[in-house]
Amino acid sequence: MAQIATNPLVLVDGSSYLYRAFHAFPSLTNAAGEPTSAMYGVLNMLKSLISQVQPTHIAVVFDAKGKTFRDEMFEQYKSHRPPMPDDLRKQIQPLHDMIRALGIPLLVVEGIEADDVIGTLALQASSLGKKVLISTGDKDMAQLVDDNIMLINTMNNSLLDRKGVIEKYGIPPELIIDYLALMGDSADNIPGVAGVGEKTALGLLQGIGSMAEIYANLEKVAELPIRGAKKLGEKLLAEKNNADLSYTLATIKTDVELNVTTDQLLLGESQKDQLIEYFARYEFKRWLNEVMNGADSITQTTEQPVKMNQYKATSQDQSAVENTPKIQIDRTKYETLLTQADLTRWIEKLNAAKLIAVDTETDSLDYMSANLVGISFALENGEAAYLPLQLDYLDAPKTLEKSTALAAIKPILENPNIHKIGQNIKFDESIFARHGIELQGVEFDTMLLSYTLNSTGRHNMDDLAKRYLGHETIAFESLAGKGKSQLTFNQIPLEQATEYAAEDADVTMKLQQALWLKLQEEPTLVELYKTMELPLLHVLSRMERTGVLIDSDALFMQSNEIASRLTALEKQAYALAGQPFNLASTKQLQEILFDKLELPVLQKTPKGAPSTNEEVLEELSYSHELPKILVKHRGLSKLKSTYTDKLPQMVNSQTGRVHTSYHQAVTATGRLSSSDPNLQNIPIRNEEGRHIRQAFIAREGYSIVAADYSQIELRIMAHLSGDQGLINAFSQGKDIHRSTAAEIFGVSLDEVTSEQRRNAKAINFGLIYGMSAFGLSRQLGISRADAQKYMDLYFQRYPSVQQFMTDIREKAKAQGYVETLFGRRLYLPDINSSNAMRRKGAERVAINAPMQGTAADIIKRAMIKLDEVIRHDPDIEMIMQVHDELVFEVRSEKVAFFREQIKQHMEAAAELVVPLIVEVGVGQNWDEAH
C-alpha cells in the first residue's frame, strides 16, 4: 500500500478544491448574507492535509482568469462548462487572501492553467530527487506520477503511486495522456477519437502500446479482442487529426517559465491579525477561537478532516461540522464469540446493561430471503462483540450451533427492559422476526435520529460516523470486493468480519450518544421522534413482511398488450422520421430530431451533445408530433420493464407475495418512499396504471380495502392560511374545485362549466407546488397572460392564501427552515442564495413543504393508531401505503366493520379547522377498491 513520504513538497490543485468545496457545502452564508461554503471547504481541506502531511514546502495553485494556449488551439476547450456561479466568484479573492494569511504560498500564473504550473514544479522537484505529493481529484494528473511523485485524493484520502495508477486505470502513468487522447475527456471537452470509449482505449493501449505505436501498427488493431475491432483501424485513421489534437490538449506542460523555485515554497507563519479579521467576518467560529487562543500555526488545529463527497452541509450544520469531536474507536475491545463460555459471559454483560446496540449481518439485503449469519453487540463502555452464526470458507473456525446460539440470545432481544439501539433497525427487526425472535425494547434508531434532526442530509452509518464522530468506518467493499465476485458476509475471514461487525455496533452506540444529545436541544423534535418516527418503524416492518398478493397471469397479459402498443408506436415514429431507427438509442434520436428534422436544441448533456431527456421531449412535443410519440413510448417501456415484466419475478417463493421496502429517511418532506417495487410510481390516472393496480389482489375469502385522504393538502392549506373562503367551502362539504371556479369566474356553482372546474383544479393544486403563470399556461394550454389573470383572480378571492405564501417565504428566509404542523423541519440552504434560480426553487419548496410534510405526518399518525387497533386481529392486515392512501386486506365478511374503523381513525389523525375526509373503497383488487 502506498504511503506518504516524509516531508514531501505538497502541490495543491486549488481550482479542483474550489469546485469540490462549493458543491459539497451549498449556500452557506454568514449573517450578512455573504456566501462562505467554498472558502470554508477549501480551508478545511487544506488544514486537514497539512495536519496530516506536516510539510515544510507547499503551494496552492489556482487557474488564472482568461484564455490559455489550449483555448487558442481548440476553441471548444472547456467551452461546455457553465459560467462560474456568482456565489462562487465572490469567494475567490477572500479565499486567496486567507490562504496567504495562513502562510501558505499561493500561485496564479496568467495565461497558464494550474495543472501546467503543478506539472512544472513537480518535475522540477522530482528531477532533484525530491518527493512530491500532488493533492487533486483530476485523473489527468496521473500522467505526472513517477518514482518521486504521488497523488492524494482528498475526497477519499486515497494515494496513487505508479502501482496505484496501474491498478486504478489498467495502464502505467506514461500512457495516461494516450488514454485521454483516445477516449477524450468530457470534463475538459477534449474530443478524443469518435467511437472510442474507455474500454476500447484500454484495449488498444494494453494490446499494442502507446498512441504512436498504435498508429504505426494500425493493421494489428483488427486482431485485438475488442468490440468492433475490424473497423476500428479505419476509424482511427480517419480521426488521426482529432487524436493528435487531443494528445496535445491532454498533455500537462512541465516546462512553464516560473519566477519561483520549489525551494522558495516554504510554509510560513500565519498572519494572526488578518486571520482574526477574516474568520470573524465569515463566522468560522472554531478557527477564530483557535487563533484567539494562541494557535499561530496552521498545523495547530483541532479541526477534523471533512470528506467533501460524503456530506452536503446545510447552514445549520456548519458549526456542527466545525466542532466535530474525534471519537476514539478502540478495536482491541472487540471480541469474537465462538464458544459457549464466551457467549454466556456476554449474555451476563448484556443482561446487566440498560442500553445495548444490536446489528445483524446477513448474506443479502433482501429482508425476506436473507440468511442471518451473525449478530454484533456493543455496550456503552466501548466493548463490542461479534457472534458468528455461519462461516463458509476453507478452514473456517467452527461456530456455535445456530439454533442454540439464537435460543440463548433470544430472551435478551425480546426483553423490553433492555433498551436497544440500531442503525436502520427495521431491517434487523424483520430478520429477527423471520428467525422466530420478536425484537422488543427498541429505543433508538440512529438513522431516524439523524433524519429527525435534519431530513435533508445523508443518514447512512458511514456518513453519520464521519459527520458526528470524525471516524472513518471500515468499508464493506474493502473486505468483500465489488461486482459479481463480491463475497457475502459469511465468506469473509472471521478476524476481519469481527472488526467490521463489532465496529458497526460500537459506532451505532456512539452515534446514539451524539445524536440524542443534539435532539434533546429541540423538545418538539424529540416528541416527533418518540411519537411518530420510532413507533412507525415497527408498523412498516410488519407491513413489509405481510406483503401483497399479485396476479402474475394478468401482468403477463398486460405485458403482451404493452408490447403490441410499443410496436405500433415504433411504426408511427418511423413514419414521422421517414426511416426506421432505434427509439432507445440516444445517438440515433439526436440525429433524427436535431440533424434531420432540425428541431431546436434546448439542452445539452455534460459532454456537449443535444439532450433528449423527457423534459426536452415534452417541450419539443408542442412543435412536432414525433417527440410526443417518443414520450409515450418511453412511458410504456418503463411500465413494462419496471412493473408488468418485473413484478412476477419479485414474488417471494415462500410467501407467494411481493414485499416492498419502505424508506423512512429518504424524502426531505417526511413522506415515505418505497422500492422493489416502487409503489409510489405506479401511474394513478391512466389506463395502464389501472391495469397494473388490477393485478394487486386479495387472497380467497378476503377483499382489498383502500382508504384515501380527500384533497388533504388543500385542506391543510386552508388550516395553515386561515383563509375563510377555503374554510367555508370545505366546512360546507362543497366541491372545492367547483367552488373555486365559481369564485374566480364570478358565476354560481350550477353555472360552472367542466372547463372552468378543470382550470380551477389546476390552480388549486398548482399553487400548492409553487407553479408559475408560465407553468399554469402550459398545463392548461392557454396564454401566459390568461394564466396570470386566473392566478390574480384566485388571490383576490382567497387573499389569506397569498398572505400565507408571503409570510412562509419570509419566515424561511429568517430562520432557514420551514415546519410542518407537528414540528418537523425542512432546512432550505438556498433560501437566501444570490442565485435567483436556486432561491426561487427554495421558495417554492418553502410553500409546499409545510403542506406535503403535514400530510405525511398525518398519514403516519393514522398508520400508528390503526396498527394498534388491528395488529393482533387475523381478519385484517395493513398491506400498502401509497401517497395519501392506505390499503388493507380484510376478511370479506368483516369489511363493513373495518371500513368504518379505518375511516374513523384516519379522519381523527389530526384536528384541523376543516374536516379531514377519507374515501374508502372495496374490491377484489386494488383498482376495484377505488
From Swiss-Prot:
This is DNA polymerase I. Its EC number is 2.7.7.7. In addition to polymerase activity, this DNA polymerase exhibits 3'-5' and 5'-3' exonuclease activity. Residues 524-930 are annotated as: Polymerase. CDD domains: DNA_pol_A_pol_I_C (cd08637), DNA_polA_I_Ecoli_like_exo (cd06139), H3TH_53EXO (cd09898), PIN_53EXO (cd09859). Single-chain monomer with multiple functions. It catalyses: DNA(n) + a 2'-deoxyribonucleoside 5'-triphosphate = DNA(n+1) + diphosphate. Keywords: DNA damage, DNA repair, DNA replication, DNA-binding, DNA-directed DNA polymerase, Exonuclease, Hydrolase, Nuclease, Nucleotidyltransferase, Transferase. PANTHER family: DNA POLYMERASE I (PTHR10133), DNA POLYMERASE NU (PTHR10133:SF27). Belongs to the DNA polymerase type-A family. Disulfide bonds: none annotated.
